[in-house]
């Protein structure tokens, strides 16, 4: 992918080259997007809309850290949807990881989570945030133990993993495909900024419906699909049950009972 590559920390120039090589990113001065490596982190900027600021992964401070400490633990909807209220801590494959917030929440509750992110720029941001979290004194130990990142298209990854004899199928496959957001729906400033940048960078997941079938084949216990409250079922397939929050819905496709049931 073509993108501007900017290094603001001269001593990290080689590191930026390695990031570009690993995620097959090519430098281009014509792109409106830039990956910027600073002293602190890797961030994405939309240069033609500087007021949007930088997008980066941060699990140590801010909203994600607050949710880990005060977010309701295993009583929150995502935990119930994944089956944590059954007395188990399932192995989860997050097949549309994005900035990793939901993966981090599940891992903070004890799950082992393997993340898949199909877009190379987002995956690079995710890897940078993961590495910084691993170095944190408070959360580094369990982040290192429970969270890993695989880079591939979600569709290909699910099929590749299903055919890999060395891969242990996850208990839960989690899907949160990007969905167009109506302008009349209220959004927080942060979500509005991220969605605006991501939808112009990545586009909507027009092939998201095709994720459900391979997810159902790969998961041992259930598939959980996060949807906006106004969105139809993924692939027009009715879930076994649904859990609703103020703005979202978790559609749960049950394959087998969780071991605690």
UniProtKB/Swiss-Prot annotation:
Gene Ontology terms: biological process: rRNA base methylation
Show the taxonomic lineage: Bacteria, Pseudomonadati, Pseudomonadota, Gammaproteobacteria, Vibrionales
Q: What GO molecular function terms would the record report?
A: 16S rRNA (guanine(1516)-N(2))-methyltransferase activity
- Matches recorded under SUPFAM superfamilies: S-adenosyl-L-methionine-dependent methyltransferases (SSF53335)
Q: What is this protein called?
A: Ribosomal RNA small subunit methyltransferase J
Q: Does the keyword Transferase apply?
A: yes
Q: Is the keyword Transmembrane in the record?
A: no
Against InterPro entries, the record matches this protein to: 16SrRNA_methylTrfase_J (IPR007536), SAM-dependent_MTases_sf (IPR029063)
Location of the protein in the cell: Cytoplasm
Q: What is its EC number?
A: 2.1.1.242
Q: What class of enzyme is it?
A: transferase
Which species is this record about?
Answer: Vibrio cholerae serotype O1 (strain ATCC 39315 / El Tor Inaba N16961)
Q: Which Pfam families match?
A: SAM_MT
């Amino acid at each position: 992918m073509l993108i501007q590559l900017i290094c603001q920390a001269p001593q990290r120039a080689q590191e930026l080259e390695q990031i570009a090589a690993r995620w097959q990113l090519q430098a281009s001065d014509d792109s409106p997007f830039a990956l910027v490596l600073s002293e602190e982190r890797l961030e994405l900027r939309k240069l033609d809309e500087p007021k949007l600021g930088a997008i980066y992964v941060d699990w140590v401070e801010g909203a994600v850290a607050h949710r880990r400490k005060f977010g309701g633990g295993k009583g929150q909807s995502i935990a119930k949807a994944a089956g944590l209220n059954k007395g188990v801590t399932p192995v989860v494959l997050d097949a549309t990881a994005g900035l990793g917030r939901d993966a981090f929440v599940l891992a903070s509750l004890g799950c082992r989570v393997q993340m898949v992110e199909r877009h190379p720029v987002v995956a690079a941001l995710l890897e940078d945030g993961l590495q910084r979290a691993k170095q944190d004194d408070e959360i580094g130990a369990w982040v290192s133990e429970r969270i890993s990142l695989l880079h591939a298209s979600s569709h290909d990854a699910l099929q590749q993993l299903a055919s890999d004899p060395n891969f242990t199928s996850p208990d839960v496959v989690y899907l949160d495909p990007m969905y167009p957001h109506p302008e009349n729906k209220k959004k927080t400033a942060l979500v509005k900024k991220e969605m605006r940048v991501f939808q112009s960078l990545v586009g909507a997941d027009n092939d998201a419906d095709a994720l459900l079938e391979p997810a159902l084949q790969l998961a041992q216990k259930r598939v959980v699909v996060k949807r906006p409250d106004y969105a139809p079922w993924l692939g027009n397939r009715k879930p076994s049950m649904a859990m609703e929050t103020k703005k979202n819905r978790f559609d749960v496709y049950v394959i087998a009972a969780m071991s605690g049931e």
